[in-house]
């Protein structure tokens, strides 16, 4: 283990020792989540009593569109939330004083957990076929929107010629 990693690990371990004592003063915490599997741990933790054992009353709150999370935190409708990295970075770049508590996932160039689905009969079979089409994403500027634009660019398609609209997952079939 490198020295920097060791120091970081020790600091993180030391910081976690104080969490139970500090958590007892937090009371109710409303946590915003979107309809993705990453938030399963939130529900498991609540069901298993992880939060209540530490003096926290955690209330999960469904947020249909990921880019709404920073604004909801700013307005104190949520105390915590899970925006995608691109949404978080845009919020902080825009002047919101938010911090990251912890990460929930990791994506690499070889990740295959995300895909693009087109309705039968849409005529969409390649990236080029998306030009002039209306594509629904669960948040403009969010992870799937940014990733889709990157995929189009890699395929040589000008993503500005694709009409992206913001739609929550249940609406994508429409």
Language-model features, listed with the residues they occupy:
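Short, glycine-/small- and polar/acidic-enriched structural segments
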Residues: 24-168
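Short, intrinsically disordered, charge-balanced linker/junction segments flanking boundaries
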Residues: 168-174
